[in-house]
């Protein structure tokens, strides 16, 4: 509940071993093997978990790299819309390991809605900026799900977390977390994360 409070979400999942696993849980909750996703390329910091060598590829997703706006180190909105209209992805992802500017979440959310896709924002490296309100909350801008690592800019224990306002996605992630991908609840890590969240209040 503290994670949900800090990130202004209706649902939060903390039974997540890492940020990479947060992405996998989210991919599994939205997609099935063979579905198409559009992801930020590595040239603008797109994370390996969104690509073929990472969990998106291991899960069997069809991965297409988004066109880039090299001046702002993010996706090119006009070209992304053309690509999404052509490919009809199940999921579009945004965010990454290197972030010079805030990403155009609202514009990408509009594209996702237009083509019937969901939008995942990977906040592994920005979640502290979001918790501290230095950057806008992706959920407020139209992201369906936000994934994160809890030990980078958030300053918590090793692990991951997922926040969403979508009850359907939250229910699927709950079942993926247990009994799907984890078999125990790490009380010590959860307590450490709770203390971290209290620091952000």
Predicted regions located by residue number:
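Conserved PLP-enzyme active-site core in the AAT-like
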Residues: 1-201
